[in-house]
Amino acid sequence: MEYTGRIIKGVGSFYTLLTDNGEFVCKARGRFRKEGITPVPGDYCRFETGGDGKGCITEILTRKNLLIRPAAANIDKLMIVLSSSLPRPDYCLADKLIMQCELSDITPVILLNKCDEMDRETYEAALAQYKDTGYDIIPVSARDGTGIDRLKAEIAGSTCCFAGQSAVGKSSLMNALAPGLELPVGGLSDKIDRGRHTTRHAQLWQVCGGCM
């Protein structure tokens, strides 16, 4: 039997697809590797299953866009997370992400996280960097809830990804939006004020009336 679904998680060679009939765990046909195509979260696919909850992806439908990092397809908005304290904002990375959005028909939204512990100079410099771009800039705090309701409204009806440096609070923000996720949270290196990488794979969750 053939179904159409959306990939919400990929781990190794196994992909979890969400359909109106529930979730199915599928493998991709070998021809995708030969053609240099890798299924990613957000892809809409056709797949065949014998009815045991397992199946085989037979076709990846036309993508609206494709992000490489994070690996995701058919994205509406990219939440670019900067810290208002430490680690200091990497504007070069943020600008690269914005450029990727512009080339991929994705709306960038800039999140200034950790505003509850902000360094005023860092916060105001980040505002000045992007205030004339026309992009939405949202001060948020995963810790005290500042801006979370506005962020939920941004996600509603959209497929969104979070991107930014390690330790800027991406996982903490997602936990604040959907506490049941319980994503692992990294911290800063005491020596170099840089983040420790904690997120190991890309995944979509249905939250706040949308996907992230």
Say what each PLM segment does.
Residues 77, 107, 158, 208-212:
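Loop/turn-to-beta-strand initiation segments
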Residues 166, 171-172, 176:
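Walker A/P-loop
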Residues 117-168:
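Canonical P-loop GTPase G-domain recognition
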Residues 179-212:
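Switch I (effector-binding) loop of TRAFAC-class P-loop GTPase G-domains
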Residues 92-102, 107:
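Histidine-anchored nucleotide/phosphate-binding helix
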Residues 1-91:
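N-terminal accessory targeting/assembly segments
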Residues 51-53, 84-87, 114-118, 143-146, ...:
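Conserved nucleotide-binding/hydrolysis micro-motifs of P-loop NTPases
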Residues 75-82, 103-115, 134-140:
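Conserved beta-strand/loop subsegment of P-loop NTPase cores
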